Amino acid sequence: MVAVPARYASTRLPGKPLQLIGDRPMIQHVAERALAAGAREVWVATDDARIAEAIQGLAGVRVAMTSSVHLSGTDRLAECARIAGWDAATCVVNLQGDEPFAPAAGIRAVAQVLQRSGAEMATLAAPVDSAHDLFDPNVVKLVRNAHGDALYFSRAPIPWHRDSFAAQRDAVPAGNHWLRHIGIYAYRAGFLQQFAAMPPGTLERIESLEQLRVLEAGYRIAVALTPEQFPPGIDTPEDLQRAQAQLASA
C-alpha cells in the first residue's frame, strides 16, 4: 500500500496539493508516481473535500477523509489505516504529498528495505554532495550503524569531522560519510498505530524531527541508499515554479 497524507493548509504554499504542475494538480502527480511504482492500492488521506475531488475518478486511487486536528502526517495515516481496515502486517509506504517527481524505484526500494530488514520502520538516504546541504539545517542528515540501521537523524552536519571542519566548511570532506535523509517511510500498519500513539520524545522536540521518536523509544529504522535520485519536495512558491519549469522542459 502507498498512503499519501495531504492537507490543504500550508504556511509557505497555501493550497499546495491543488497547485497545478502542467495541467494536473500536484496531488494527482504524486498519486500517479505511487501507481507507477506498482502499489496494489494508493490512498490519499486528507481532511479537505477539494483534495478528494481533485483525484476523484483516478483509477487505483482511494480517499480517506480524516480529521482536521491531526498534528502530523503520521497521525493522519494512522487514521487512514483504521478507515481502510488494513491488517497489522500490511506494508504501508508513506509518500509525502509534495513529492510529484518521486521515482518509482525509490518507492519500491523503501518497501523492500522494510521487508528484508525485519526493522519496525524503513527509510532512504542519499549522499550529501554539497557543503551548502551539509550545513543547511533544512537538509536532515543521518548516520547508520554497520547493519544499515539509523543511529541518529539531525539538522546538524553529522558526523562532525573535527579536523576538516576546523580547517574549512566550503566543501564536503572526502570519504562519503555524509548522508541526507529522504523523507519517505515504510512500516507495518500495526507499528504505524504504535508510532502515532507514542508521546513525542525529548530528541524529537529538540530537533523537530518526528522519526527520532522511534529511535528514542528503542525501535529500529532501516536505511538504504536510494537507487535513483530523489528530486526535492515542493515547499515554497519558488519550488513550485522550478517544478513547473522542469515539467515544461521534459
From Swiss-Prot:
Main location: cytoplasm
UniProt EC number: 2.7.7.38
Pathway connected to this protein: Nucleotide-sugar biosynthesis; CMP-3-deoxy-D-manno-octulosonate biosynthesis; CMP-3-deoxy-D-manno-octulosonate from 3-deoxy-D-manno-octulosonate and CTP: step 1/1; Bacterial outer membrane biogenesis; lipopolysaccharide biosynthesis
Keywords, comma-separated and alphabetical: Cytoplasm, Lipopolysaccharide biosynthesis, Nucleotidyltransferase, Transferase
Molecular-function GO terms, alphabetical: 3-deoxy-manno-octulosonate cytidylyltransferase activity
GO process terms (BP): CMP-keto-3-deoxy-D-manno-octulosonic acid biosynthetic process; lipopolysaccharide biosynthetic process
Signal peptide location: none
Catalytic activity reported: 3-deoxy-alpha-D-manno-oct-2-ulosonate + CTP = CMP-3-deoxy-beta-D-manno-octulosonate + diphosphate
SUPFAM superfamilies attached to this UniProt entry: Nucleotide-diphospho-sugar transferases
Gene Ontology CC terms: cytosol
Gene3D superfamilies: Spore Coat Polysaccharide Biosynthesis Protein SpsA, Chain A
Family: Belongs to the KdsB family.
NCBIfam families linked: kdsB (TIGR00466), PRK05450.1-5 (NF003952), PRK13368.1 (NF009905)
Free-text function comment from the UniProt entry: Activates KDO (a required 8-carbon sugar) for incorporation into bacterial lipopolysaccharide in Gram-negative bacteria.
Protein name per UniProt: 3-deoxy-manno-octulosonate cytidylyltransferase
Upper lineage: Bacteria, Pseudomonadati, Pseudomonadota, Gammaproteobacteria, Lysobacterales
UniProt gene name: kdsB
